[in-house]
């Protein structure tokens, strides 16, 4: 079982709770992160959830690289808009060879056509989308038991 899971959130996800609540709900990113930490702590086996958010692509790439050094065993990533544009994030994930789940709050396939393309999905262990913030809970649970 994985002991260290890294939750990465990309651009604009720091605005959760106030950004387009009709699409993304009213739960803040801080609340999602705390719920995930509590979820890991409840395992009572030393499991740990590390969290990271950045609006900057290069900082996300750097954090993925650091995850390998930190002994992270699984990544849960909502790359936000970078999902549809970032070869750099894809290559960082592949370069570290850390298994990952791609998560999205909304069902990206019910949205604009440009959101239907993901640079991550074909390499992800799983893709979770459209479950609201519960998608994080499900993804973290899977990662902790991987």
From Swiss-Prot:
Function: Is involved in the catabolism of quinate. Allows the utilization of quinate as carbon source via the beta-ketoadipate pathway.
Keyword terms of this UniProt record: Lyase, Quinate metabolism
Broad EC category: lyase
Entry EC number(s): 4.2.1.10
PANTHER family: CATABOLIC 3-DEHYDROQUINASE
Pathway: Aromatic compound metabolism; 3,4-dihydroxybenzoate biosynthesis; 3,4-dihydroxybenzoate from 3-dehydroquinate: step 1/2
Subunit structure: Homododecamer. Adopts a ring-like structure, composed of an arrangement of two hexameric rings stacked on top of one another.
Binding site for substrate: 78, 84, 91, 105-106, 115
GO molecular function, one term: 3-dehydroquinate dehydratase activity
Family: Belongs to the type-II 3-dehydroquinase family.
Gene3D superfamilies the record matches: Dehydroquinase, class II
This protein's encoding gene: DQD1
GO biological process per UniProt: 3,4-dihydroxybenzoate biosynthetic process; quinate catabolic process
Residue numbers annotated as active site: 24, 104
Pfam families documented for this protein: DHquinase_II (PF01220)
Name assigned to this protein: Catabolic 3-dehydroquinase
Site (Transition state stabilizer): 19
Source organism of the structure: Meyerozyma guilliermondii (strain ATCC 6260 / CBS 566 / DSM 6381 / JCM 1539 / NBRC 10279 / NRRL Y-324) (Yeast)
Catalytic reactions on record: 3-dehydroquinate = 3-dehydroshikimate + H2O
Coiled coil residues, start to end: none
